[in-house]
Regions:
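Short secondary-structure boundary elements
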Residues: 1-127
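Tandem amphipathic alpha-helical repeat scaffolds
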Residues: 40, 80-84, 97-101, 116-131, ...
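Conserved small-residue-rich
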Residues: 137, 143-144, 156-177, 182-185, ...
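Tetratricopeptide repeat
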Residues: 78, 97-98, 135, 139-146, ...
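Start-of-helix signal in alpha-solenoid helical-repeat scaffolds, especially tetratricopeptide repeats
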Residues: 30, 34, 51, 55, ...
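Charged, low-complexity surface patches
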Residues: 2, 180, 192, 220, ...
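Flexible helix-coil transition and linker loops at the boundaries of alpha-helical arrays
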Residues: 63-71, 85-88, 128-135, 139-160, ...
């Protein structure tokens, strides 16, 4: 009865071309077709209620995450809804996930993403791929805004370290070594301040990759030593294996 009334109401709206179903979704989802109707509905809802609704919708999208490359389609929704909800740190987390996807570190020595991952074929994806420099500037501005608005909270510090790692890797990969190293050294410093051993290890590894690229075997040896000690302290067996392979490489360079 109540569900039936809702369904009948939706059918009336659909028959009058006010809404349409969103295809290829596991649940039944409708979207508003007419822009003026969207604007009217927005005007009827207070700003506070809009924020609550956007936060609720973001939560629904998060439940659909599969922790696979296909999640990139959901990251754009999550970034938008968290931004509209005023949850800047959550927005930033998904913006950085989008950035990581499009930087696609498949050419790195030990890639995070497979080059076989398929880029989604949509307008947003094509825009980012063809305007990467502009997108990087947007992300940089976003980080300044988040730090200015939210202050130095643990969540903001974690976001900042993630950002420094991504940007450092990117700049080193494209040969802008000065920028890249500056970001990675800043990452190591910040991670040490908050005793975040995972980010410290990420920073050390990135400096090792940089030293391989420029042939600096002595500095590489030093970073390998501190990285191996840290990985041993943390019982990170997989990381130990990677670092020992790199140590072997260092010995024959």
């Amino acid at each position: 009865p109540e569900h039936l009334q809702v369904f009948q109401g939706l059918e009336v709206l659909r028959n009058n071309n006010f809404i349409r179903p969103v295809p290829q979704q596991p649940e039944v989802i409708y979207e508003i077709v007419q822009q003026k109707l969207k604007e009217y509905i927005h005007q009827q809802i207070s700003l506070e209620k809009q924020k609550i609704l956007h936060s609720y919708i973001a939560g629904l999208w998060e439940k659909r995450l599969t922790h696979s490359p296909q999640d990139i389609r959901l990251y754009h929704h999550l970034e938008y809804h968290y931004q509209e909800a005023g949850e800047l740190v959550n927005m930033g987390r998904y913006k950085l996930k989008i950035l990581m996807y499009y930087l696609n570190f498949s050419n790195e020595l030990f890639p995070v993403l497979s080059s076989a991952d398929i880029m989604p074929d949509d307008d947003k994806s094509r825009y980012i791929e063809s305007n990467l420099g502009k997108f990087l500037a947007e992300v940089d501005e976003m980080m300044h805004t988040i730090k200015r608005t939210c202050g130095e909270t643990p969540e903001v510090r974690d976001l900042e370290m993630n950002y420094l790692h991504l940007m450092g890797r990117h700049y080193i990969r494209v040969g802008e070594y000065e920028k890249g190293v500056r970001n990675i050294l800043s990452l190591i410093e910040q991670a040490a301040e908050v005793h975040n051993r995972d980010y410290m290890l990420m920073g050390y590894k990135q400096m090792i990759y940089y030293d391989i690229q420029i042939g600096n075997t002595e500095e590489m040896k030093n970073y390998l030593e501190v990285a191996l000690n840290l990985a041993d302290e943390c019982n990170y067996h997989k990381e130990m294996g990677i670092l020992l392979r790199l140590k072997g490489l260092n010995m024959i360079m």
